[in-house]
Amino acid sequence: MTLDLSKPATAGYLSGFANEFATEALPGALPHGRNSPQRAPYGLYAEQLSGTAFTAPRGHNRRSWLYRIRPAAVHRPFEPYAGAQRLVSEFGDSADVPPTPPNQLRWDPLPMPVEPTDFVDGLVTMAGNGSAAAMNGCAIHLYAANRSMQDRFFYSADGELLIVPQQGRLFIATEFGRLDVEPFEIAVIPRGVRFAVALPDGNARGYICENFGALLRLPDLGPIGSNGLANPRDFLTPQAAYEDREGAFELIAKLNGRLWRADIGHSPLDVVAWHGNYAPYKYDLRLFNTIGSISFDHPDPSIFLVLQAQSDTPGVDTIDFVIFPPRWLAAEDTFRPPWFHRNVASEFMGLVHGAYDAKAEGFVPGGASLHNCMSGHGPDADTFEKASASDTTKPHKVDATMAFMFETRTLIRPTRYALDTAQLQADYFECWQGIKKHFNPEQR
């Protein structure tokens, strides 16, 4: 099976989360009984791609063996890349990262580019924390593009890329095979995996959380039991597919927040077979099994957790990826929207589709908001008044929505670009100014 991004994929996927997969595009391309034979089938080269330390515990160890036409080392030397100058990977004080205000922040969608712009050149860093060099924290990027990647390929050595499309499908050709991803789905490209992105719908826009630290995993379910939230079988990994092309190609690498380019005389998407548990995957957010209260109160948003990156502190994650999908609300005598909140964690939100049930207006698909550590937030004035007077004896369906959140244990620091851009809503704070005083000490 070969790669062709000019049309939708016809191959199926491999089902499961972090399984030990084995797949080949040519019969017998996978060596039998060993990883690195003296001579691999079809004249291929054996190459291991390690996503964790060799000595990581078996349950956390991630690696794959790739059988490819040429090793990944075959390319010309890298040199600085002149494009995509709005990326940041170090989130200490700098010209790119000014002092972080405690204000609630919200942005309109990133505009579509006027000039031809592909996925790589359409990247801009909005915020983040930690350090790519120290392999902790994350960077939160937006992308807006209107052209497919042409004879160029990209990888990030800084972290795994959690991609959340908001507008336009992405046909992603990777070393492991192909992922077709549309809005309402997510894709995760592991650190180091080379890929190219085609835009079948012309324009594309979305969000990326680049995870510098421990790999994303499914959360433990605790009292929920053995099923629920994001079920492992619904995660899809590509089957092996390759292209054997020679020509003048460009390989772009992201290392320590900077982009580098190298000439390469062949397509690096030349893996004919592979096996292992370190591979790209996608997931349809519409398959999320939402948990909620059927008595009273609005549970904590941790019930909406899709993926987590764990820290060295039990119960505290470096990154939580949370969604707010369509769902039924049935709690009686309860304020049903998300409540007013101050959080030790920091919250970057985006909206894929529809409206968010805590904001009547201003938060639109493609937009974003940031509520940092201990910054008060919650429903706007209109939402509060309506929800306080609604009939809670009847269930209500929150429909036509798909919001999400990147939540982190440490401060999410907006970049200079994010604080200076015209998309920043200077009047965001006004949505709470109309909240009325109802207190009356004479009337309970």
Curated annotation (Swiss-Prot):
A single Gene Ontology CC term: cytoplasm
The protein's Enzyme Commission number: 1.13.11.5
Entry keyword RNA-binding: no
Pathway note: Amino-acid degradation; L-phenylalanine degradation; acetoacetate and fumarate from L-phenylalanine: step 4/6
UniProt: Fe cation binding residues: H341, E347, H377
Reported cofactor(s): Fe cation
Pfam family, one: HgmA_C
Key words of the record: Dioxygenase, Iron, Metal-binding, Oxidoreductase, Phenylalanine catabolism, Tyrosine catabolism
GO annotation, biological process: L-phenylalanine catabolic process; tyrosine catabolic process
Active site (catalytic residues): H298 (proton acceptor)
CDD domains membership: cupin_HGO_N
Iron keyword on record: yes
Domain of life: Bacteria
Subunit structure: Hexamer; dimer of trimers.
Record function comment: Involved in the catabolism of homogentisate (2,5-dihydroxyphenylacetate or 2,5-OH-PhAc), a central intermediate in the degradation of phenylalanine and tyrosine. Catalyzes the oxidative ring cleavage of the aromatic ring of homogentisate to yield maleylacetoacetate.
Similarity annotation: Belongs to the homogentisate dioxygenase family.
Name by which UniProt lists this protein: Homogentisate 1,2-dioxygenase
Organism listed in the record: Burkholderia cenocepacia (strain HI2424)
